């Protein structure tokens, strides 16, 4: 697509957005051209909060399907569109409400903590929803002496266990992108770039390794933490150990820093399904509206509402 074609699509999208009083939300993993047209760019927590606060009549969520579903749970009176409704997530697809209910039978006093990367059905049987930005804080605040099930991300769960010392039963799910970011790869990059920090998302396999957690050159944190890090550090070189599309925003903010993706080709194929044409068509035809059964939505909202209290 030529730049002229891109600009024409931008103009069409802006016109449609104004006509329909719509707001465009995009995750940092979206294509750069999607990021540029978004009204709000953020990680899962930030976008969830924006979805609950916007005055727009329509929310167009440029993210995978569970993100659009979460926006609808938070803003039931808004029309929420997901340009690619079949854009999935290996984490969200890996957890089931049935599995959680089976665990509850064995642990009637247990607490279920679910990552935001889950379906509405899973959120509905969850006690606390979390994101990578607030998971540590929420788990630390849970009452002691009660069993905890954390899911679906086993790597994030193990990282939380290592940092907090809380024992948890872990669902064995994983993000296929971050599953390739191993301890061995991180150690290789530490040796190759001795002046660099490695910024690691806690969904990564490496984040579950205590030697990585304890290494002062390894900064483990949410997408927003990773993106903000070069702005609060004097170092010039950073290895980015997460989905590489975050470099679009990081490069824009920190043009004087050297930002090196740990796996430049390991991208989220689901996020890349969302294109400018698909965004334009979603607005034009108001298609792919997200619907959540009201009884299910109310149950799912409870776990999200508890998250917002932290």
Predicted features, each with a name:
Residues 1-240, 246-310:
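Active-site loop-to-helix "anion-binding N-cap" substructures in soluble metabolic enzymes
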């Amino acid at each position: 697509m030529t730049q002229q074609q891109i600009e024409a699509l931008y103009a069409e999208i802006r016109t449609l957005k104004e006509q329909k009083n719509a707001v465009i939300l995009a995750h940092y993993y979206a294509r750069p051209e999607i990021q540029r047209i978004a009204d709000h760019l953020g990680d899962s927590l930030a976008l969830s909060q924006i979805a609950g606060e916007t005055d727009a009549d329509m929310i167009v969520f440029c993210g995978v399907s569970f993100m659009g579903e979460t926006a609808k749970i938070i803003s039931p009176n808004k029309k929420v569109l997901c340009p690619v409704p079949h854009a999935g997530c290996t984490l969200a697809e890996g957890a089931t409400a049935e599995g959680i209910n089976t665990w509850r039978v064995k642990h009637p006093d247990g607490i279920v903590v679910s990552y935001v990367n889950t379906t509405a059905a899973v959120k509905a049987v969850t006690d606390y929803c979390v994101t990578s930005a607030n998971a540590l804080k929420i788990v630390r605040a849970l009452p002691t002496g009660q069993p905890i099930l954390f899911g679906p991300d086993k790597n994030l769960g193990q990282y939380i266990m290592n940092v907090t010392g809380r024992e948890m039963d872990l669902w064995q799910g994983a993000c296929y992108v971050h599953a390739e970011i191993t301890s061995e790869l991180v150690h290789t990059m530490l040796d190759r770039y001795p002046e660099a920090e490695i910024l690691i998302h806690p969904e990564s396999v490496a984040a579950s390794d205590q030697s990585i957690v304890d290494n002062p050159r390894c900064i483990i944190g949410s997408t927003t933490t990773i993106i903000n890090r070069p702005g609060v550090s004097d170092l010039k070189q950073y290895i980015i150990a997460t989905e590489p599309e975050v470099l679009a925003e990081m490069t824009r903010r920190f043009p004087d820093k050297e930002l090196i993706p740990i796996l430049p080709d390991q991208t989220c194929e689901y996020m890349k399904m969302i294109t400018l044409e698909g965004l334009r068509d979603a607005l034009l035809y108001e298609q792919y509206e997200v619907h959540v059964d009201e009884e299910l939505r109310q149950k799912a909202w409870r776990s999200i509402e508890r998250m917002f209290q932290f």
